[in-house]
Regions:
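Sequence-structural signature of the catalytic-core scaffold of metal-dependent phosphohydrolases
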Residues: 1-40, 47-271
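Terminal helices and disordered tails flanking the catalytic cores of nucleotide-processing hydrolases
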Residues: 215, 223-378
Length: 378
């Protein structure tokens, strides 16, 4: 909420408004209203997250549901309506800004609403991403996620979108969050911080396997293997409730989630058996799947896990205004931004019971499995 407020105050400062987008900026009274709505949207943006956040979401909600839809339901709930009434804020304005155009399908976004939602959920400069990088790096005790957020925010501007092939003239009058040329190094630092946090922390193989064990536990424990979408039940289900049940399950061999709970509580998690390399990718684009299938045949499906992930929303193309007033694509102004890698992982894990035997098997068979594309359809 604090970062969203800072961005809003900077980009609506009359001295910072580009002439081509001045017409979309509301009058002063409306500016005060939209500042309140934006702050509440930033505060409510993650209301719909399940216990332990993203770890549980993909396979543990009924079809058609995700945390953005749950967020919308919570914002619109009867419990929240008195708050919006007291604040003189329309709940639908809060909902739109909180989840953005990709997840709010009930009406179109005008240019102003699109910019405000971009402040929160934007791929390049969304404050949700700024916040979790800074927060997570602090609490984990690493420096990967740090960048100069104050310098970056001070140089943000609303600018017309620009096509990379159009070097001097904007490709569209549609506005987007961009940056002054003087802030380009801060933007580079943000995007590199995101890359390093994903490659070194979020996608670390041990962290990922605990997500898998947690998901397996929840599937075995929750009624029907999914979370309820009832607002009342959702609010009652917290991290503490899950942790308490997991601790209980780890001590009870008859509990349906015993095996997964024990992996977490006793730190006997599955171990990394295979991690795809660039060389493997050149030989077989589905090398991880091939190893997984072969390992399942050798050791049994219950002893093997497969985990893949490709980073989404690079959001590297944004407008940059030069000191002489010309507007360029970020990709033409920064080789660093152009070349930030996309994080992609492909892991195969083995149970501790089979680890030694599996490592010997891997040494003898890995090259053949990858080269022969064993069990993988073309």
């Amino acid at each position: 909420m604090e970062l969203a407020s800072r961005v809003y105050d900077v980009i609506t400062d009359p001295d910072n408004i580009h002439e081509s987008v001045r017409s979309i900026i509301p009058r002063k009274f409306d500016l005060e209203y939209w500042r309140r709505a934006l702050r509440m949207a930033a505060l409510c943006h993650d209301l719909g997250h399940l216990p332990f956040s993203h770890a549980a979401e993909r396979d543990l909600l009924p079809a058609g549901w995700d945390h953005e839809r749950l967020t919308l339901e919570l914002i619109r709930s009867g419990e929240m309506e008195p708050i919006w009434t007291a604040m003189k804020v329309n709940s639908e304005d809060v909902a739109k800004l909180a989840v953005g155009p990709k997840h709010y399908k009930d009406s179109r976004f005008d240019d102003w609403e699109a910019i405000l939602s971009e402040i929160i959920v934007g791929d390049a400069f969304g404050v949700d991403r700024m916040d979790y990088l800074l927060r997570d790096s602090h609490h984990i005790g690493v420096a990967y996620g740090r960048f100069d957020q104050y310098r970056l925010i001070d140089t943000l501007r609303i600018l017309p979108k620009v096509d990379r092939t159009s070097e001097e003239e904007p490709g569209s009058q549609e506005p987007a969050l961009g940056i002054e040329e003087g802030g380009i190094h801060s933007a580079e630092a943000l995007l590199l911080a995101r890359y390093f946090m994903f490659s070194q922390v979020y996608c670390h193989h041990v962290r990922r396997i605990y997500d898998i064990h947690l998901k397996d536990f929840l599937k075995s424990w929750l009624p029907g293997g999914v979370f309820s979408t009832s607002i009342e039940e959702l609010l009652r289900m917290t991290d503490s409730e899950v942790t308490q049940e997991l601790s209980k399950a780890a001590r009870d061999e008859n509990h349906p989630g015993f095996d997964s709970a024990r992996c977490i509580a006793k730190r006997v998690h599955f171990r990394l058996l295979y991690q795809r390399t660039r060389e493997d990718l050149e030989k077989n684009r589905e090398s991880g799947k091939a190893v997984f299938i072969a390992a399942c045949k050798e050791f049994g499906e219950s002893e093997v896990r497969h985990d893949t992930y490709i980073q989404k929303g690079s959001g590297l193309n944004f407008p940059v205004i030069a000191r002489d007033g010309r507007i360029f694509s970020s990709l033409s102004r920064s080789e660093t931004i152009e070349k930030v890698p996309v994080v992609a992982i492909d892991y195969v894990y083995i149970s501790p019971v089979c680890r030694k035997r599996a490592e010997t098997w891997r040494e003898k068979n890995l090259t053949r499995i990858i080269s022969s594309k064993e069990g993988v359809e073309e």
